[in-house]
Amino acid sequence: MADPWQECMDYAVILARQAGEMIREALKNKMDVMIKSSPADLVTVTDQKVEKMLMSSIKEKYPYHSFIGEESVASGEKTVFTEQPTWIIDPIDGTTNFVHRFPFVAVSIGFVVNKEMEFGVVYSCVEDKMYTGRKGKGAFCNGQKLRVSQQEDITKSLLVTELGSSRKPETLRIVLSNMERLCSIPIHGIRSVGTAAVNMCLVATGGADAYYEMGIHCWDMAGAGIIVIEAGGVLLDVTGGPFDLMSRRIIAASNIALAERIAKELEIIPLQRDDES
């Protein structure tokens, strides 16, 4: 039987490239920067333009599909997550990087049916790296097959995470104490590139052994989540329970043993779910 979603995925790759071109062009020009939920949560006109282009292109081709987009939600739309084929879009993952011209900026497109991730496309456009993952078909970067590391020993692991955009003292305390706890196990190190999607793709490549974060959103995870799984990795909730795309938290790891070991160390940040906002 023909893959019903392959055409959608091929289209997502074309659109991600177009969006990347818009972003690269915008990097040459002066930017108007606005603030969203905190002084460290930024948005630009380019975020909004790219999302508009992606949404209108997809809606024209697939009018009966559903959509969740970061900038649409920021402008007041509800996150409605149903069984319908749903495109989950982050037009610029790494807006702060974009504003500072720090070279990790990604377009993330996830596609979910019956609440299951079917495919993901993450285009790291400054690096010109196109990451793709299709349920049951593997994960690739620029056509090269991806495979997670086989590292199960946390003391030999390299982790990726972020400080996040919240500047609330209690949230920062938890974020930093979690890092301190993990570092003192000890582990080899912690890295951050400033975009959840690229952090997760680095786990898929085997370059990092695991990624964890709390406070991100479904549009940060939907594209890269399936890429990690298809590269042989696992997704887990930070409690060690099953991963939930609407929960705003994740451990993406090369294997279950490492994911569960990380979960043991984490103090949980209380968060409002995406589907409750």
UniProtKB/Swiss-Prot annotation:
Family matches, as Pfam families: Inositol_P (PF00459)
Recorded GO MF terms: fructose-1-phosphatase activity; glucose-1-phosphatase activity; glucose-6-phosphatase activity; glycerol-2-phosphatase activity; identical protein binding; inositol monophosphate 1-phosphatase activity; inositol monophosphate 3-phosphatase activity; inositol monophosphate 4-phosphatase activity
InterPro entries from the UniProt entry: IMPase, Inositol_monoP_metal-BS, Inositol_monoPase_Li-sen, Inositol_monophosphatase-like, Inositol_monophosphatase_CS
Highest taxon of the lineage: Eukaryota
Chain positions recorded as substrate binding sites: 70, 92-95, 194-196, 213, 220
Keywords recorded for this protein, A-Z: Cytoplasm, Hydrolase, Lithium, Magnesium, Metal-binding
PROSITE patterns linked to this entry: IMP_1 (PS00629), IMP_2 (PS00630)
Entry binding sites for Mg(2+) 2: 90, 93, 220
Tissues of expression: Ubiquitous.
EC number: 3.1.3.25, 3.1.3.94
Pathway: Polyol metabolism; myo-inositol biosynthesis; myo-inositol from D-glucose 6-phosphate: step 2/2
Positions with a binding annotation for Mg(2+) 1: 70, 90, 92
Gene Ontology CC annotations of this record: axon; cytoplasm; neuronal cell body
Regulation: Activity with myo-inositol monophosphate and D-galactose 1-phosphate is inhibited by Li(+), Ca(2+) and Mn(2+), but also by Mg(2+) at concentrations above 3 mM.
Localization: Cytoplasm
Chemical reaction(s) catalysed: a myo-inositol phosphate + H2O = myo-inositol + phosphate; 1D-myo-inositol 1-phosphate + H2O = myo-inositol + phosphate; 1D-myo-inositol 2-phosphate + H2O = myo-inositol + phosphate; 1D-myo-inositol 3-phosphate + H2O = myo-inositol + phosphate
Cofactor: Mg(2+)
Function: Phosphatase involved in the dephosphorylation of myo-inositol monophosphate to generate myo-inositol. Is also able to dephosphorylate scyllo-inositol-phosphate, myo-inositol 1,4-diphosphate, scyllo-inositol-1,3-diphosphate and scyllo-inositol-1,4-diphosphate. Also dephosphorylates in vitro other sugar-phosphates including D-galactose-1-phosphate, glucose-1-phosphate, glucose-6-phosphate, fructose-1-phosphate, beta-glycerophosphate and 2'-AMP.
Family: Belongs to the inositol monophosphatase superfamily.
PANTHER family for the chain: INOSITOL MONOPHOSPHATASE, INOSITOL MONOPHOSPHATASE 1
Record's subunit section: Homodimer.
Designated name of the protein: Inositol monophosphatase 1
Species of origin: Rattus norvegicus
Lineage: Eukaryota, Metazoa, Chordata, Craniata, Vertebrata
Recorded name of the encoding gene: Impa1
